[in-house]
């Protein structure tokens, strides 16, 4: 659990140094997107394999792939290599959290799991806070490569504990139909979409055959994905659940917040290090208030939801986050890290409340047997939104940065990556040009923050889609049986980090238990 949360936050603070050393700012977004897309596509596979071949064996296999990917990332000597290795690392990352949650469901009773969730909350919160700090410290004092190597001792320790200590309970092994067509079409349409969004208007004209073909191919593969999911006996994404208004609203809001959240998290360290001129360690400290905001929202969000209901909590969360997003658009070369930390407190509090409400609204709108599936849909859409959001933010920033650097250095062939390498920036950029470079990056990243604020505003408009009811009411209305959300809501406070908030609710009431229910309906919960 610690490793999953740590890996989700540790890389961002090292990215300015990485792209500076590897000279690949044009591929900035793909370091995040490749990891997310690989993780999204493989989580359902790992979940099914765990049912078919045993939790321990599959967990160790996934951890091995993740650790090999971490070593390869640390050995990368070009951006293309790093992107490829990040995708490989994402294949293993898709196993760690969901299979660990399933192991928890196997080992503990429902009553015990309620207590265990408190431990998970503490672990996720702690890892999410120290992740950026560790990433910055390692980058400044050792090398950016250590943000990947640090996974190795933690991962080995976890694998040894599982291997030696865990006694896997006897259980029926379930055969599953793997939705290979769904996986292939999902990867196809998302990769083509991310490619078009990231390179359109910058590397290729929007009207060019490359971009038009990519977008057309994405639409065709999306249609194929929908058809595949409708026909599959065990789909990655059970589309029938989108007929439920509360779940549909939660998915839309989760997508928009994923786009906003990942856009801010991925590019804010770049602003702190390049524009303000601080170290990677300072950039890590700047992100800490965002994670603290998530923790506070997690601690009180469940109780608040019981009092005010879904729509009011979402509206309150957006009302908190939008001022923070707006203040981020006001940052410039004269801003301080204290100002950014202040802004991120509001963003973290707001996002924490909204994401918690989305997850519980989705869970509360379905039967207990489908609760894990609903949780997975919300998490799936958030991560998918994150991959798309990072691509959009990168396109906006790089397009603006190219124009601004061209204006600042007319006639010069400027490589923006030169300004990001601590070892070379002072030699290659004359002191007189440093201010122009800072202003160019500031203006470009301003466009990123404006884009994030617009996405957040769209989320506010979607508040009306969210049901008014309080926990328990939606399931009563939809299914006419006793609500179980009251047992879930207080412990849903474990949604404390950008990479983990939806999975935490899954193990509480939606985990698949061998021999019970219908595996095909529950497994897709691991698609997030």
Give the positions of each predicted feature:
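Short, Lys/Arg-enriched, Gly/Pro-containing loop segments at transmembrane-helix junctions
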Residues: 171-176, 234-240, 405-409, 470-481
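Transmembrane-helix exit segments and adjacent C-terminal regions of multi-pass membrane proteins
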Residues: 227, 246, 360, 423-528
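Transmembrane-helix bundle of Major Facilitator Superfamily
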Residues: 1-164, 297-302, 307-308, 312, ...
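Transmembrane core module of solute transporters
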Residues: 2-45, 143, 181-183, 190, ...
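C-terminal module of multi-pass small-molecule transporters
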Residues: 47, 53-64, 77-81, 99-102, ...
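A membrane-interface helix-boundary motif in multi-pass transporters
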Residues: 140-152, 199-210, 279, 399-453
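C-terminal membrane-cytosol helix-exit motif in multi-pass small-molecule transporters
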Residues: 153-171, 188-199, 218-231, 459-467
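Central mid-sequence intracellular linker of multi-pass
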Residues: 154-191, 241-243, 409-417
């Amino acid at each position: 659990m610690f490793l999953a949360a740590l890996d989700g936050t540790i890389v961002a603070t090292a990215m300015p140094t990485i792209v500076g050393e590897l000279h690949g700012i044009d591929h900035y977004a793909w370091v995040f997107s490749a990891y997310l897309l690989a993780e999204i596509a493989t989580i359902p596979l790992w979940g099914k394999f765990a049912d078919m071949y045993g939790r321990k064996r599959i967990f160790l296999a996934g951890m091995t792939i993740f650790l090999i990917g971490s070593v390869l990332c640390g050995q990368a000597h070009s951006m293309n290599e790093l992107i490829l290795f990040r995708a490989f690392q994402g294949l293993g990352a898709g196993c760690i959290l969901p299979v660990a949650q399933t192991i928890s469901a196997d080992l503990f009773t429902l009553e015990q799991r309620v207590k265990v969730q408190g431990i998970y909350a503490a672990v996720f919160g702690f890892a999410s806070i120290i992740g950026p700090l560790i990433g910055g410290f390692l980058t400044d004092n050792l090398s950016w490569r250590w943000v990947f190597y640090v996974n190795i001792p933690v991962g080995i320790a976890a694998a040894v504990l599982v291997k030696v200590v865990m006694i896997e309970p006897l259980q029926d092994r379930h055969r599953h139909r793997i939705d290979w067509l769904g996986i292939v079409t999902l990867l196809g349409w998302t990769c083509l979409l991310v490619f078009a969004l990231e390179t359109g208007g910058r590397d290729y004209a929007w009207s060019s055959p490359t971009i038009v073909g990519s977008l057309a191919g994405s639409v065709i593969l999306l249609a194929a994905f929908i058809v595949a999911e409708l026909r599959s006996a065990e789909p990655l994404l059970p589309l029938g659940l989108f007929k439920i208004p509360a779940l549909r609203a939660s998915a839309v809001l989760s997508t928009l917040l994923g786009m906003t959240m990942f856009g801010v998290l991925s590019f804010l360290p770049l602003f702190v290090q390049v524009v303000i001129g601080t170290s990677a360690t300072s950039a890590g400290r700047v992100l800490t208030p965002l994670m603290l905001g998530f923790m506070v929202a997690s601690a009180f969000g469940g109780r608040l939801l019981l009092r005010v209901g879904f729509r009011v909590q979402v509206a309150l969360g957006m009302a908190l986050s939008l001022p923070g997003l707006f203040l981020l658009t006001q940052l410039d070369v004269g801003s301080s890290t204290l100002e950014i930390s202040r802004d991120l407190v509001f963003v973290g509090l707001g996002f924490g409340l909204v994401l918690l409400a989305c997850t519980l609204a989705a869970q509360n709108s379905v039967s207990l047997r489908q609760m894990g599936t609903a949780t997975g849909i919300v998490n799936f859409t958030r991560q998918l939104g994150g991959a798309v959001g990072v691509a959009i933010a990168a396109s906006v920033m790089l397009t603006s940065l190219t124009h601004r650097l061209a204006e600042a250095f007319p006639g010069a062939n400027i490589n923006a990556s030169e300004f990001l390498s601590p070892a070379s920036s002072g030699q290659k950029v004359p002191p007189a040009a440093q201010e122009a470079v800072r202003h160019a990056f500031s203006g470009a990243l301003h466009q990123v923050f404006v884009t994030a604020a617009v996405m957040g505003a769209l989320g506010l408009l979607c508040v009306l889609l969210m049901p008014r009811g309080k926990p328990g009411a939606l399931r009563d209305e939809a299914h006419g049986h006793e609500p179980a959300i009251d047992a879930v809501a207080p412990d849903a406070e474990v949604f404390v980090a950008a990479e983990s908030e939806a999975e935490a609710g899954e193990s509480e009431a939606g985990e698949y238990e061998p021999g019970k229910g219908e595996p095909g309906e529950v497994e897709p919960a691991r698609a997030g």
